[in-house]
Structures are given as structure tokens and as C-alpha cells.
Amino acid sequence: MFAVIKTGGKQYRVAAGDEIRIEKLEGAAGDTLDLGDVLMLGSEAGVTVGSPTIDGAQVIGELLDTNRARKIIVFKKRRRQNYRRTKGHRQWGTVVRIAEIVAPGEKAKTALKSTTAEPKAADAPKAKAKAAPKAEKAAAPKAEKAPAKKAAAPKAAAADALTELTGVGPALATKLNEAGITTFAQVAAWTEADLDALSETITGLKAKAEKNDWINAAKALAK
């Protein structure tokens, strides 16, 4: 018997005893897991196709290992702009062995188990019980103390004219201000992660910042 399953956005044709690598699943080696939606079942009696899945069908796999695949090199280049970026990426994945394929109406012989979930649940009450006495001891002195005066709010830094940066017009400056970027010092302190985060809300920001060298320009203007 074989089955076609869907897990992690991909489809796999599997049979009992097969070892496959799929997108990362939570669990430890030795766990038995339900491997997602069953789209099709095939046997000597014929083929059953789901619409889109087969109710009652199940594919059970044993988790063997969770590791990262070989490194993939991602190279980006822009002509006539002296722009080159080389990055590596290793995708996490899980290796599983197909333990059993269960057809609708049949009872699974392999029980689902997780070696990581049960200990965490058992340890939680102990941690709470230990933390409770400390909380009670600390609560009493705080009640006796006079209420602390609220600290004065720090004065907001004066906003800079971000339009002095090449490629920043009034509309883009407004978007940056709405995102909390109001000074050259903030622009000068940008990191690669900051640019990626801002590009999610302001389209094309990272490309403009790198093309016009905003970070170095902001450092000069912030002095």
C-alpha cells in the first residue's frame, strides 16, 4: 500500500518503511507522529482519491532526526551599482520513517507518542510551587514602602529634515516618521536586520538606502 501525503506545503508519495526528509516538525528522536493530510491511497484493490483529503486515513511516521540540510549560496548582484551580496542558507528539516499507513475504518497498530511533551507538563506545577513563596516574601515589603514618584518622561529628540538624504522626498520622509525614524542618528545606526524590517512596511526602502548610502550620509549629517 502507498499513500500521498501533504505536510509543510509539499506532497510526498510514501510506503511503509520509507525514509523521507520533510519540513521541520516539533519533536524528539523516537517520537511517532501523524504526518498530515492524506490525499490519496493506493493498494491492490485500487486507488482512492480524497476531496481534497481522505477522512479517516492516517500516515504514521517515526521521527529519526532533525537537522539542517547542506548550505545553499544566495548571490545577488546589480549591474553598474557596485552591489554584490553573498549569503548562505541551511534549511531545517526532519527525517522520518513511515511506520504505518492506516486506511479509513481500520485501527492504527502504532500509537502516537511524544517524548518531549509529557515532561514539560509535569515540570510546570513544580516550577510554579517553588516560585510562589518568593513572590509572597517579596510582596510584603513593597506594600510598606511609599509609592515611588513617577520619573519625568525623557524629552523627545528634535526631528531632523530627512529629506536632506538623497532619494528621500516628503512622502517617504512622512512614512519614515510614522515608523518612528525622525533623526539622522537613527538612520546612521541602522543594521541589516533593521532595513529588512522596515522594508516590510515601506516597499523598496532597503534598496534605496543601499543605493544612496544613507547610513554613511546620515552619520555625516548627524555630526
Curated annotation (Swiss-Prot):
One of its GO terms (biological process) is translation. This is Large ribosomal subunit protein bL21. Pfam families: HHH_5, Ribosomal_L21p. GO terms for molecular function: nucleotide binding; rRNA binding; structural constituent of ribosome. It comes from Maricaulis maris (strain MCS10) (Caulobacter maris). The gene is rplU. The keyword rRNA-binding applies. InterPro entries: bL21-like, bL21-like_sf, DNA_repair_Rad51/TF_NusA_a-hlx, Ribosomal_bL21. Part of the 50S ribosomal subunit. Contacts protein L20.
